[in-house]
C-alpha cells in the first residue's frame, strides 16, 4: 500500500491539523510501504537553518515512521520550497524533483505539486520562475533569518489577497498544460495537489484515456490517496482522531 497526501500547511496556529497528522503517522502510515507528501507540507519554510521547535517535532515524527520501515518522499510546494537536505536527513525522507515519474500498481504515474500547471496565472508563474531560479535560491538562503521571515509574511499575505481577487479558472490548472505535461512524460495518470479541489478528472492524452487525481488539502478534514490492489482511492477523514 502507498499513501499520498499534500497541502497540510502545518503551522503552530492549527494544532488540530498537527494532532491529526501525528495520529495518521502513528497509525495508518505505519501500514504503508511508502508515504508521498506532494508539497505545501508546511504553511511556511524560511530555510533549514531557521527550523523551530515545532518543525523539529514534525521531523522527529517522520523519522520515527521512516525508522519503522515506511519510505517517505517529500516534494516542494509553493509555500515550502526552501526545505533542504538538513531537514530531510533529520526526518528520514527523500526529496523529490517536480515533476517526478514513478511506477505505481504496474503503471507509470506522474507526481507534481501542481502550481506549475496553473499557467493562466501569469503573475504567479513569473514569480515562481524567479523564486525557483538557482541564483535566487542561493540569495534567499543567505539572507538573514529576520529578512526571510518578513519576506515570507509579505509573499503569503499577497498570495492570499490575490487568490481572493482572481477568477477560479486562473488559479486552477490549465487543461492544455496538463495534457502537454502528461504527454511529455508518457503517463496516463497524474497526481497533484495545490488547488485544494479534490477530484478525479477524466481526460484524453494522445488519443488514450487518462486521469488526473487532485489531492485534497487538510483544513476542515484530512485527505489521503491510497494506492493498492484495489486501485487509486482517495477519501476524507475527520481531523480529530477517534
From Swiss-Prot:
Biological source species? Ectopseudomonas mendocina (strain ymp) (Pseudomonas mendocina)
Tell me a GO cellular component: extrinsic component of plasma membrane
Q: Which cofactor does it need?
A: Mn(2+)
Q: What is this protein called?
A: UDP-2,3-diacylglucosamine hydrolase
Q: Which gene encodes it?
A: lpxH
Annotated SUPFAM superfamilies: Metallo-dependent phosphatases (SSF56300)
The signal peptide, as residue positions, is none
What subcellular compartments does it reside in? Cell inner membrane
What the entry lists under CDD domains is as follows: MPP_YbbF-LpxH
Amino acid at each position: 500500500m502507498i499513501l499520498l497526501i499534500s497541502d497540510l500547511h502545518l503551522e503552530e496556529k492549527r494544532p488540530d491539523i498537527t494532532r491529526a497528522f501525528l495520529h495518521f503517522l502513528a497509525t495508518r502510515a505505519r501500514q504503508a510501504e511508502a508515504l508521498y507528501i506532494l508539497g505545501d507540507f508546511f504553511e511556511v519554510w524560511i530555510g533549514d537553518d531557521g527550523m523551530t521547535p515545532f518543525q523539529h517535532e514534525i521531523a522527529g515524527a517522520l523519522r520515527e515512521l521512516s525508522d519503522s520501515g515506511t519510505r517517505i518522499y517529500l516534494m516542494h510546494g509553493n509555500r515550502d520550497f526552501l526545505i533542504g537536505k538538513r531537514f530531510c536527513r533529520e526526518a528520514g525522507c527523500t526529496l523529490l524533483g517536480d515533476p517526478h515519474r514513478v511506477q505505481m500498481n504496474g503503471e507509470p504515474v506522474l507526481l507534481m505539486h501542481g502550481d506549475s500547471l496553473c499557467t493562466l496565472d501569469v503573475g504567479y508563474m513569473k514569480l515562481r520562475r524567479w523564486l525557483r531560479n538557482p541564483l535566487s535560491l542561493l540569495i534567499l538562503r543567505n539572507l538573514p533569518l529576520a529578512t526571510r521571515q518578513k519576506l515570507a509574511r509579505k509573499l503569503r499575505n499577497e498570495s492570499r489577497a490575490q487568490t481572493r481577487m482572481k477568477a477560479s479558472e486562473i488559479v486552477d490548472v490549465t487543461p492544455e498544460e496538463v495534457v502537454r505535461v502528461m504527454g511529455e512524460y508518457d503517463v496516463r495518470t497524474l497526481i497533484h495537489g495545490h488547488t485544494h479541489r479534490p477530484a478525479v478528472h477524466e481526460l484524453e492524452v494522445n488519443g488514450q484515456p487518462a486521469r488526473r487525481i487532485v489531492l485534497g488539502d487538510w483544513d476542515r478534514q484530512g485527505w489521503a490517496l491510497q494506492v493498492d490492489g484495489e486501485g487509486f482511492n482517495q477519501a476524507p477523514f475527520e481531523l480529530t482522531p477517534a
